[in-house]
């Protein structure tokens, strides 16, 4: 049985949230008060989603911060 490659939370952020909502990485970074580089690195899969970022994303998108932490945990464990 072939394993499916894990998806980094940054890809989900980009494809399921930013693109469909028409939000730029820069706009998100400014709105949640983090450096734009942080969002860019998350989207490109070179930075993990920290608890702090999960809280900010959760508040911004009106979903549980646990959603983001779970995505990161699943990616890390794959």
PLM features per residue range, with description:
Residues 23-41:
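Short alpha-helical DNA-recognition segment
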Residues 46-59:
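Short, basic-rich loop-to-helix N-cap that marks the start of a DNA-contacting helix
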Residues 20, 31, 60:
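Residues within the alpha-helical elements of helix-turn-helix
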Residues 41, 45, 74:
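Alpha-helical DNA-recognition elements
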Residues 1-23, 70:
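A short, Lys/Arg-rich alpha-helix, primarily the initiator
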Residues 67-78:
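Short, charged recognition helix plus adjacent turn
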